[in-house]
């Protein structure tokens, strides 16, 4: 019995090649035929332009019907701590102002959400103007009476002012909110100038030069 690593014994006379297709070599055996698609991850890699998009439409799970009522939460979810139902979660979440705005506004426009677009009818139809009694009608349009219920909402205005106090008129969303077309345009160089690689290199060189200059006067400063 020969060693496992020893070559097979040579035959004296050349043997004929076996008829039929050659058995696949080891490198070929693991390569699937070209018709079988390669198994790649289905997600898109942001830095790789060749990476595929999401899975094709017919492979996705079906989307739930948006008109269907929301699915009930299973009670198993509430075995963990802390457990909060959806309305509790909504009440506890810090940015949620729906319940802080008070009950839905009365018809007529004095309530806490009077002019609010989110409070209109289910078909988003605007509310009818309030029917004023005949005594409340102004006798003379030229004399400036006290105005009716204000359409300006001071809370929302204050919120908007507070928001733009931090962003300023150079912010591109400022123009969108205030309706001026080209007002809040931030120049690209101004925005990206201090973060791009060229500036980083330049700052690094400046810092290095400062260190060299500081090292030059070191022996005179510390005798």
From Swiss-Prot:
Question: Which organism is this entry from?
Answer: Homo sapiens
**The protein's name:** Putative HTLV-1-related endogenous sequence
Which residue ranges have biased composition labelled Low complexity? Answer: 1-19, 133-157
Q: Region Disordered: which residues?
A: 1-184
Compositionally biased residues, Basic and acidic residues = 115-126
């Amino acid at each position: 019995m020969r060693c496992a690593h020893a070559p097979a014994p040579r035959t004296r006379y050349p043997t004929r090649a076996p008829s039929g297709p050659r058995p696949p070599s080891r490198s070929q055996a693991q390569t699937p035929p070209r018709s079988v698609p390669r198994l790649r991850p289905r997600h898109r890699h942001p830095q790789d332009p060749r990476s595929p998009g999401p899975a094709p439409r017919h492979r996705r799970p079906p989307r739930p019907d948006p008109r269907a009522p929301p699915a009930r939460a299973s009670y198993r979810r509430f075995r963990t701590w802390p457990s909060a139902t959806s309305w509790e979660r909504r009440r506890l979440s810090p940015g949620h102002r729906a319940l802080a705005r008070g009950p839905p506004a009365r018809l007529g426009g004095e309530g806490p959400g009077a002019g609010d677009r989110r409070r209109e009818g289910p078909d988003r139809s605007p509310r009818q103007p309030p029917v004023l009694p005949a005594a409340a009608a102004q006798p003379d349009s030229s004399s400036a009476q006290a105005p009716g219920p204000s359409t300006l909402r001071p809370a929302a205005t204050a919120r908007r002012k507070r928001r733009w106090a931090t962003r300023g008129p150079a912010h591109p969303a400022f123009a969108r909110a205030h309706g001026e077309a080209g007002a809040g345009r931030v120049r690209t160089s101004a925005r990206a100038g201090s973060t791009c690689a060229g500036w980083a290199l330049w700052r690094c060189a400046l810092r290095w030069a400062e260190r060299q200059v500081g090292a030059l006067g070191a022996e005179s400063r510390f005798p």
